[in-house]
């Protein structure tokens, strides 16, 4: 504190009685961005409304849930999709169970929010305005206690206590800006399967991915309740939200398992991310309340005009109130308008919002791959006792061929490999096993938020594809399932589920075609007899009940041209690393 006091003394000429324009502008931008982040965060959370402190996500082990549904521990009786909540567009962004677009909005706005936060913090220290919220003496604590007692007595400290904030406000603002925000930033990356797989040590700092997710949620909840106090507090939670966000990407988590271990595991990071969101919600409520309860005339004059109330005229104060009302109306209009604009044309929104995130993805997460196997992140002791599923095996209406093969224990099943190849080939399960096998213990990451660890046995995709020779123009691999996609976004009849695999994933050692799970033949409910595993990505790329592999020229020529069934119907992104 002595060093800070010396710095404060040296910066004594800084005017703290007025609020410079840059401070007011960055605060307003932050206010708008936080609204977007909270509402899109609710959309993501509603997809799996449960929070855990462990990676296994076993029903009953959650520490917080927003559903009354009871989940059977018999795999397949209750799916993760059954657990999804449908929120109104007035509540979440965009609403109506559109998690794909919710994730897109969350990613895009996070980047804008970070840039605005960087500008704010840089100017805060560059201009000496940091003294507004950084304590420089230990006396801050007894002074804050005195302020708290005044508030608890339902009284308001006199205006002399505010320079420009009283001790309690200053302490709270410091906590939000320099403690909670970094915690939110720190837990955010852990939501990425790529990040968590690449930096498992980082995840362990937060115990595990689900703990990080829970912390992230609590940060959001705190903000929602606290918003009324002061927008400045946002930047304590912000860094933590940012840090845990990438861990939600399977690619990031798999590429940096050490980073994931900083948060203990991926679910711990997810919880931390939630805690940050909760913190923001609490902060917003508290901030707004104090602005209009504790000396509102002074607060409004400072926020809108940057001037002291005693130095302005009645007309100027009226102008400040008008500006405040307009600002709030504009913010609410943007929040609600974004939902209805998104829902008015789902495909357009998917292309625009996900497309806007691509430059940042190309510089960051898309450069990473999971290294869970190479780093031996998990052992057999880590295998989950329960694994969620979000689809059910093919029905007779979807594939009579599959039902016939299943009746004879898949003895006549042959995997087809064709498309743009010189000669198509097919393989039985035994023939695939004869080509070679690998055993990987990895964490499955669903874009809904749940995780599970299992031991997978199969053949590396790149080794299998050596059995055929692609022709010129073969750039992507398409995996097609016996099963159908669960729904289509525009109500069309469902079609066989497919996903297109990027060449960079095909060469990944953690990309395998699995026929075994936990030392047993792959159970039907988890995709037997064959399923794709691509642990740098979210689960929707890992096709179950694989019927055929084929080389294609361009994924834009298949289906709706988005790269797979979940991209076509669920409006997800082709590269599922984040």
Regions flagged by a language model, labelled:
Residues 1-365:
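Membrane-embedded alpha-helical bundles that constitute the cytochrome b-like, heme-associated redox core
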Residues 94-99, 428-430, 462:
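Short acidic (Asp/Glu) patches
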Residues 106, 169-177, 216, 273, ...:
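His-enriched metal-coordination microenvironments in redox/metal-binding proteins
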Residues 110, 166, 170, 174-177, ...:
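Short, well-structured alpha-helical interface segments that form or flank functional binding sites
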Residues 403-456:
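A glycine-rich, hydrophobic loop/mini-helix early in the fold
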Residues 419, 458-466:
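Alpha-helical support elements that line or immediately flank enzyme active sites
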């Amino acid at each position: 504190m002595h060093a800070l006091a010396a710095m404060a003394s040296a910066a004594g000429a800084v005017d703290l009685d007025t609020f410079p324009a840059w401070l007011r502008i960055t605060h307003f931008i932050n206010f708008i961005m936080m609204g977007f982040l909270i509402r899109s965060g609710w959309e993501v959370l509603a997809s799996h409304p449960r929070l855990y402190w462990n990676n296994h996500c076993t029903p009953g082990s959650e520490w917080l849930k927003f559903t009354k549904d009871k989940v059977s521990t018999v795999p397949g009786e209750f799916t993760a999709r059954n657990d999804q909540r449908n929120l109104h567009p007035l509540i979440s962004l965009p609403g109506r169970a559109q998690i794909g677009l919710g994730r897109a909005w969350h990613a895009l706005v996070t980047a804008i929010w970070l840039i605005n936060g960087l500008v704010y913090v840089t100017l805060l220290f560059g201009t000496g305005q940091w003294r507004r919220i950084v304590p420089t003496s230990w006396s801050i604590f007894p002074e804050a206690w005195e302020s708290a007692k005044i508030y608890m007595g339902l009284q308001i400290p006199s205006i002399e206590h505010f320079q420009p904030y009283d001790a309690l406000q200053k302490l709270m603002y410091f906590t939000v800006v320099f403690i909670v925000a970094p915690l939110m930033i720190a837990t955010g990356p852990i939501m990425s399967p790529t990040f968590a797989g690449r930096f498992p040590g980082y995840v362990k700092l937060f115990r595990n991915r689900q703990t990080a997710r829970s912390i992230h949620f609590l940060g959001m909840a705190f903000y929602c309740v606290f918003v009324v106090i002061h927008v400045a507090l946002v930047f304590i939670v912000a860094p933590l939200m940012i840090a845990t966000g990438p861990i939600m990407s399977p690619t990031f988590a798999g590429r940096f398992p050490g980073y994931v271990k900083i948060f203990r595991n991926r679910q711990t990071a997810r919880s931390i991310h939630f805690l940050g969101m909760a913190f923001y919600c609490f902060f917003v409520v508290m901030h707004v309340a104090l602005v209009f309860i504790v000396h509102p005339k002074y607060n409004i004059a400072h926020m809108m005009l940057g001037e002291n109330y005693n130095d302005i005229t009645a007309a100027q104060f009226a102008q400040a109130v008008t500006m405040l009302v307009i600002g709030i109306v504009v913010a609410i209009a943007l929040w609600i308008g974004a939902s209805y604009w998104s829902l008015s044309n789902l495909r357009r929104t998917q292309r625009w919002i996900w497309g806007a995130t691509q430059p940042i993805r190309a510089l960051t997460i898309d450069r990473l791959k999971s290294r869970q196997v190479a780093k031996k992140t998990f052992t057999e002791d880590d295998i989950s006792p329960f694994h969620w599923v979000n689809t059910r095996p093919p029905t007779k209406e979807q594939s009579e061929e599959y039902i016939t093969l299943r009746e004879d224990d898949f003895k006549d099943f042959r995997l087809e490999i064709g498309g743009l190849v010189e000669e198509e080939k097919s393989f039985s399960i035994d023939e695939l096993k004869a080509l070679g096998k690998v055993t990987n213990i990895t964490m499955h990451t669903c874009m809904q938020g749940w995780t599970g660890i299992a031991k997978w046995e199969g053949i590396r995709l790149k080794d299998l594809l050596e059995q055929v020779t692609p022709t010129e123009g073969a750039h992507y691999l398409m995996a097609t399932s016996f099963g159908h996609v669960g729904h289509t976004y525009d109500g069309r009849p469902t079609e066989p589920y497919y996903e297109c695999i990027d060449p960079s994933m095909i060469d990944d050692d953690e990309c395998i075609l699995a026929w075994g799970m936990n030392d047993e033949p792959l159970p039907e409910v988890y995709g037997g007899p064959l399923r794709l595993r691509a642990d740098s990505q979210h689960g929707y790329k890992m096709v179950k009940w694989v019927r055929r592999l084929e080389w294609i020229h361009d994924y834009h020529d298949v289906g709706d041209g988005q790269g797979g069934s979940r991209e076509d119907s669920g409006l997800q992104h082709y590269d599922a690393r984040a």
